Design a protein with these regions (language model features):
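Active-site loop of short-chain dehydrogenase/reductase
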Residues: 7, 62-63, 90-91, 136-150, ...
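Conserved glycine-rich cofactor-binding loop
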Residues: 8, 15-16
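Conserved glycine-rich Rossmann-like NAD(P)H-binding loop of the short-chain dehydrogenase/reductase
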Residues: 29-52
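Substrate-binding pocket helix/loop in short-chain dehydrogenase/reductase
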Residues: 105-106, 110-115
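A short, exposed helix-loop element centered on a Lys and neighboring polar residues
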Residues: 129-130, 176
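Catalytic loop of short-chain dehydrogenase/reductase
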Residues: 137, 143-184, 195-198
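C-terminal helical subdomain
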Residues: 191-192, 211-291
Length: 291
């Protein structure tokens, strides 16, 4: 799909899950990866730290720079970007993957949770993109990729968890605005979102339980889709809100069974996927058991 040798990547929140899968996918093709994440010590429910992620990236074939970073902190983000440039000599790709989630209605959303989601999802995305931008402008094929949904402004996405939806759509609004702003500068800005729920520790340990993983795809589908986007010409592919399997089908992928956690179970559709999205495989609404 692409050659990422000599590509220098900054990715937030890549100590586990989708972010780590993307980092390892790019590392397998020779990329140097700076991992910006808070987890220095193992979490009681969520496996992986910035240091274990770095080990996996090196094992995959890339270089790794683990950087303990609170994406909400101006000083820490600025320092992390500076360390990346010092270590790698520049930045070609910025991936805004870090995300905070609270699937709660208005009355049950504490303001500290609201501030966390907006601090990580919106402010963190904007700030990391902003700090990387001077270096991206010097790169040959610069990309910003946000792990955020299409801007499908439907009440059904907002009503159950207003604050979370606002924050994720805020990440997508960064794509809409920055893609337009940077179009004449050759910096691509795109979004990538999963069609089905992805099997991560957050799903099994925090949101839906271990049994839910059977209805998911593995993070590898997001990693492969991200690689496909980041291999494209930044001057020709920007401002797109991509769905993982739809994009891969356009790239010629035909066998999606390799991504299923359990081939016997149907897949759950993820939040925020527009109704008119082509179904590459049949999907059920989240939480619906197999028929």
């Amino acid at each position: 799909m692409g050659d990422f040798s000599n590509k220098r990547v900054v990715i937030s929140g890549a100590s586990r899950g989708i972010g780590l899968a993307i980092a390892k996918r790019l590392a397998a093709e020779g990329a140097s990866i700076a991992i910006l994440a808070k987890t220095a010590e193992p979490h009681p429910k969520l496996s992986g730290t910035v240091y274990t992620a770095a080990e996996e990236i090196v094992q995959a074939g890339g270089q790794a720079l683990p950087l303990i970073t609170d994406i909400r902190s101006d000083d820490q983000v600025q320092a992390a970007v500076a360390e990346t440039v010092q270590a790698f000599g520049g930045i070609d790709i910025c991936i805004n993957n870090a995300s905070a989630i609270s699937l709660t209605p208005t009355a049950q959303t504490e303001m500290r949770r609201f501030d966390l989601m907006f601090g990580v999802n919106v402010r963190g995305t904007f700030m990391l993109s902003r700090e990387c931008l001077p270096h991206l402008l010097e790169a040959d094929n610069p990309h910003i990729l946000n792990i955020s949904p299409p801007l499908d402004m439907q009440q059904k996405w907002f009503a159950p968890n207003v604050a979370y939806t606002m924050s994720k759509f805020g990440m997508s609004q960064c794509v809409l605005g920055m893609a337009g702003e940077l179009a004449d500068k050759g910096v691509a800005v795109n979004a990538l979102w999963p069609h089905s729920v992805i099997a991560t520790a957050a799903i099994s340990n925090v949101l839906a339980g271990e049994a839910a993983l059977a209805y998911c795809r593995s993070p590898q589908i997001m990693a492969d889709a991200a690689a496909a986007i980041l291999a494209k010409d930044s001057r020709e592919f920007s401002g797109n809100f991509c769905i993982d399997d739809v994009l891969l089908a356009q790239e010629g992928v035909t066998d999606f069974s390799v991504y299923r956690m359990d081939p016997e179970k149907p897949l759950w559709s993820d939040f925020f996927v527009p109704e008119d999205t082509p179904e590459i495989e049949p999907l059920l609404a989240v939480g619906n058991p197999a028929p």
